[in-house]
């Protein structure tokens, strides 16, 4: 709370799943939210996260209604989040949030693989390739077609 009073820019990095737990007072102290939207379709979201999509959608709308700047991040995972209908659903949702100033399409990579092994856990995406440059551009274009600033 004191950071903003000292003129320090404040940011929250979140999937939005627990956004309902943020009080209005907490949100008053946030300048920017990095909102990870992992899917626009409930079934795909559940497959990716094991959770419901609605809390993320609700939190994004709440942020926009409060005038809080949002940067949306979308992780592009071949065979998981790359379906055109899924990307369209995310892009439509994001385009409806007036305070989104940036969309980052983040190509999937394997840099976290060792973390799973060190935890003794099976890594479900072990055989998943990085998306091709053409796929990344297709997805970015889907967001750009809605006049969004895309990186």
Regions found by a protein language model. Name each.
Residues 92-95, 101, 117-142:
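A structural motif corresponding to the C-terminal lobe/cap of the Radical SAM core domain
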Residues 145-151:
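Radical SAM enzyme core and accessory elements
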